[in-house]
């Protein structure tokens, strides 16, 4: 016991650092064996050598298996590192107390037996080097296959080194007491990386206190199970993270598909609205052409009983097929309310038209014309001749002088065909009572001009029949009107005459809404044989022949501005 082999071994191990990080360090096992005395106690030395060989055979495969398993657990490495450090410190602290007693139990052996021990230690170092290389390559492979791009770390635990202590009473126990042993022997350390972070282990002698060793091993085994459970939890976290990422990716794809479906649905709705609008327009046009009665007319008529919106719909088709000399001017009234929405359900159109007629207020329409902007229409008439009368009298045609219908009338005055839009219509016409007398009188004192919102193809043929003697000087048709919100307005500036000497008679007051002071309203006529409106206007018209400006007289007579202001 006094003269024996004094052995010192240093083991430098890298503990709990990532292979990827540049600041992590990898340490290798380095042993140095110095023999100062020969061991004379051969049986105990043989037992120690035998235990070293068994330990080397167990450590290498155990470490390799554990490194392979731990290569896959790369999340929460700080938590696992803290557990391993705590276990290592507690275990080595407990074993340090045993090293003193183990020294006294081991007797020196002969120098001849030191060589097998050194060979066993070199075998352990070589195995740990290979284990470090395999750990590095395994960690790199795991990093490349990591779905969530979380860096993996190599974790080295000493549990496998200490697990054999249950069966072996004497084994090699790491010690971290300092850089020198109790006898003052030198310990050489060697590191591969630049920065120093060392774990020193002193290969001292073993203790024979089986009870303390059993307690320590039991504690380390329980801690090892906790480490394994922690690594399993890390694996579960990795799987959950991968599933969350996959679910998020699927949710993004689903959201994109839903957005595309919504856009497609909106486009289909727009297309359906356009088709429905066109269908409604066609239905309204066909209804206006087929459901004609004493108060209705085809699209070449301008009938007061037609709703302005319906008139706008029917004239859209007819204006494209008839060639005219002047362009129709259209303006838009600036109103806050809009009636352009499409109704999903259509009731009886005749009832709707009657309701719209009751609701339509021509004086309110004229009041709103103050917000309208329009370009002056081009002059449609030649200059007035010097031989012509001073005052120009503008007359409306339908429901002012005559009433026409495509439905048979009782005792019509005229019947004539009209070929319109590839369709031939039979028109039945009746002249207003006292029409001939009225026309004869006014043609002698006024320049008579017909200004109608009807189509030329119809109105021109009718005028040729009711005015065979050409008492009417000029004829203007729909193409000379101004279209405003479903109504055809007659801007008197198209005449090229001085408005001080222009008078217009129309059954639709909104028709002369731009020049209210020049307009004389008259009641619409259909079939009343007792009507005398035309005859009663002659005296007032005759009173205007000698005035310089007809507008103040018309204003005082009919007081239309009061009706407009009250609308």
UniProtKB/Swiss-Prot annotation:
The keyword Hydrolase applies. SUPFAM superfamilies: HAD-like. Pfam families: NIF. Residues 337-360 have a biased composition (Acidic residues). One of its GO terms (molecular function) is phosphoprotein phosphatase activity. CDD domains: HAD_FCP1-like (cd07521). Coiled coil: none annotated. Keywords: Hydrolase, Protein phosphatase. PROSITE patterns: FCP1. Its EC number is 3.1.3.-. Residues 298-308 have a biased composition (Polar residues). Residues 31-53, 100-150, 280-361 are annotated as: Disordered. Residues 386-544 form the FCP1 homology domain. Residues 100-118, 130-150, 286-297, 309-332 have a biased composition (Low complexity). Belongs to the CTDSPL2 family. Probable phosphatase. This is CTD small phosphatase-like protein 2.
């Amino acid at each position: 016991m006094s003269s024996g082999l004094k052995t010192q071994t240093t083991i430098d191990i890298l503990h709990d650092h990532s292979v990827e990080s540049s600041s992590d360090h990898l340490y290798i096992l380095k042993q140095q064996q110095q023999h100062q005395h020969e061991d004379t106690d051969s049986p105990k030395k043989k037992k120690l050598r035998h235990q070293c060989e068994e330990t080397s055979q167990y450590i290498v495969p155990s470490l390799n298996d554990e490194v392979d398993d731990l290569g896959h657990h790369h999340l929460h490495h700080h938590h696992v590192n803290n557990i391993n450090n705590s276990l290592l410190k507690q275990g080595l602290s407990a074993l340090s107390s045993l090293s003193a007693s183990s020294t006294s139990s081991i007797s020196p052996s002969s120098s001849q037996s030191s060589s097998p021990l050194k060979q066993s230690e070199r075998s352990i170092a070589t195995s740990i080097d290979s284990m470090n290389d395999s750990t590095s390559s395994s960690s790199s492979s795991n990093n490349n296959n990591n779905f969530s791009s979380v860096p993996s770390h190599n974790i080295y635990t000493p549990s496998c080194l200490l697990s054999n202590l249950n069966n072996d009473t004497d084994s090699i126990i790491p010690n971290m007491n300092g850089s020198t042993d109790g006898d003052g022997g030198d310990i050489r350390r060697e590191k591969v990386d630049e920065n120093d972070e060392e774990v020193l282990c002193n290969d001292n002698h073993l203790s024979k206190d089986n009870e303390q060793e059993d307690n320590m091993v039991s504690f380390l085994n329980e801690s090892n199970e906790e480490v394994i459970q922690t690594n399993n939890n890390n694996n579960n976290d990795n799987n959950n993270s991968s599933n969350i990422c996959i679910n998020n990716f699927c949710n993004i794809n689903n959201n994109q598909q839903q957005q595309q479906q919504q856009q497609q649905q909106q486009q289909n709705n727009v297309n359906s609205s356009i088709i429905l609008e066109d269908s409604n327009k066609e239905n309204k046009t066909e209804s206006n052409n087929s459901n004609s009665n004493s108060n209705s007319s085809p699209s070449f008529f301008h009938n007061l009983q037609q709703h302005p919106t319906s008139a706008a719909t029917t004239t859209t088709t007819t204006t494209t097929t008839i060639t005219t000399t002047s362009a129709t001017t259209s303006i838009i009234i600036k109103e806050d309310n809009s009636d352009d929405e499409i109704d999903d359900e259509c009731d009886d159109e005749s009832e709707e038209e009657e309701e719209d007629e009751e609701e339509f207020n021509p004086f309110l329409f004229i009041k709103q014309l103050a917000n309208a902007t329009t370009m002056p229409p081009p002059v449609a008439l030649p200059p007035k001749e010097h031989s012509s009368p001073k005052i120009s009298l503008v007359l409306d045609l339908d429901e002012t002088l005559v009433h026409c219908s495509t439905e048979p009338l009782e005792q019509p005055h005229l019947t004539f065909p009209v070929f319109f839009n590839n369709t031939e219509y039979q028109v039945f016409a009746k002249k207003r009572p006292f029409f001939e007398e009225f026309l004869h009188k006014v043609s002698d004192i006024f320049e008579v001009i017909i200004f109608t919102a009807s189509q030329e193809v119809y109105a021109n043929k009718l005028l040729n029949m009711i005015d065979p003697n050409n008492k009417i000087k000029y004829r203007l048709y729909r193409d000379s009107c101004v279209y405003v919100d479903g109504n055809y307005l007659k801007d008197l500036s198209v005449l090229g005459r001085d408005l001080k000497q222009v008078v217009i008679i129309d059954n639709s007051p909104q028709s002369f809404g731009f020049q209210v002071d020049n307009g004389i309203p008259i009641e619409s006529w259909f079939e009343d044989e007792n009507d005398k409106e035309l005859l009663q206007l002659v005296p007032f018209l005759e009173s205007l022949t000698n005035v310089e400006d007809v507008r103040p007289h018309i204003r005082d007579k009919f007081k239309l501005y009061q009706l407009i202001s009250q609308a």
